Amino acid sequence: MTIIFLICLDASTQSTTNNSINNNNNNNNNNNNNNNNNNNNNNNNNNNNNNNNNNNNNNSKVFDFNIF
């Protein structure tokens, strides 16, 4: 009876350990995905800002024409 109990206890412990590992892996994956999304958003924002700055620079150019 003791052997059966220990086997069941070991299986239960292993299952709990596996669940904990899976949860940690899922959390890590979620964190990585969030970081990737944040990086992508930051890159997009930077690109948009650069485009806006370029547009503003192009629009603000002054051309001097000397007429003789």
Swiss-Prot record:
Q: Which residues form the signal peptide?
A: 1-15
Q: Where is the composition biased (Low complexity)?
A: 22-59
Q: Which domain of life is it from?
A: Eukaryota
Where in or outside the cell it occurs: the entry states:
Secreted
Which sites does the entry annotate for glycosylation? Answer: 18, 58
Keywords recorded for this protein, A-Z: Glycoprotein, Secreted, Signal
UniProt keyword annotation of Ion transport present: no
Record region (Disordered):
14-68
A GO cellular component annotation in the UniProt record: extracellular region
What is the name listed in the Swiss-Prot or TrEMBL entry for this protein?
Putative uncharacterized protein DDB_G0277445
List the source organism: Dictyostelium discoideum
